[in-house]
Amino acid sequence: MTWPTIARKEFADALGSRMLWAIVIIIALMTSLSAGLSLLIPEMEPDAAVAIGGASQFAALLVPIMALIAAYLAIAGERESGSLKVLLGLPPSRGEVLVGKFLGRGGVVAIGLVLGFLVSGVVTVAIYGGLPLTAFVGTTALTALLGVSFVGIAIGISALTATRARAMTLAITAYLGLTLLWDLVPNAVHLLVTGEMPGQVVPAWLLLLQGLSPTGAYNALAQALLLGSGTAVEARIGGPAPAYLHPGAFLAIMLVWTLLPLVVGYLGFRRADLS
């Protein structure tokens, strides 16, 4: 059994467990609801681009936890049950198992997110009569990449852990640390350096710190896509944007968060005693 075979099996198993359709339904429902929010806020002018921005904000919170749930037991669950020893006896290498499970689970999450966003795109057209295609396609692709990044994190966690309970603990910690609590660190650094909390205009390094998490990088890229790559940043820092705030830098951060956990997970998994 090779990694493509493992990837296909992971994808088929996810279809059988309705994981794909759960992702589609949840993302379609939440992003479609966000598309109509501007109609309910009197101070906000109804606009399809604003609706896409709202959908990306919902996605930044929902996608990480969905991707982690989809993948955190991919290796740890089979390791605890003993079925992983059977799989490794077929025989794929441990690296092939990790790559196959990442591609299979990552494919399920990415396809589910794309389908969910397509539904919300139809809803947006129905509400606003049109859709800014470039912004929509770009946001959809970024959201799929965010999902794949957290699948990489989840597979890395799963490869490093021997039990379901430990994998779950680390997955929850990753979600809290990289999504809900990350901004506390840049704000605390700003307070220590300047003696005050961030205001309307902030130093450029603060935006870099905020964007060092996969969710922060996603938010920075989505904002650049919807508002213009330089406009939003220059307004926030009150001057020209340095090179390290270029969208390419944040894209690289997301790719690092996708691949580095896999490498770390593989190094631990390669030495693990499965007996």
Regions found by a protein language model. Name each.
Residues 93-107:
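Membrane-interface alpha-helices at helix entry/exit sites of multi-pass transporters
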Residues 34-66, 104-165:
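Secretory targeting signals
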Residues 25-28, 168-178:
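Central hydrophobic cores of alpha-helical transmembrane segments
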Residues 47-52, 68-90, 102:
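Transmembrane helix boundary and interhelical loop/hinge segments in multi-pass membrane proteins
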Residues 1-61, 65-66, 99, 136-141, 168-169, 235-275, ...:
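Hydrophobic alpha-helical transmembrane segments
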Residues 64-71, 119, 153, 169, ...:
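Hydrophobic/aromatic residues in alpha-helical transmembrane segments
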Residues 37, 41, 180-259, 263:
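Terminal transmembrane helical anchor/hairpin motif
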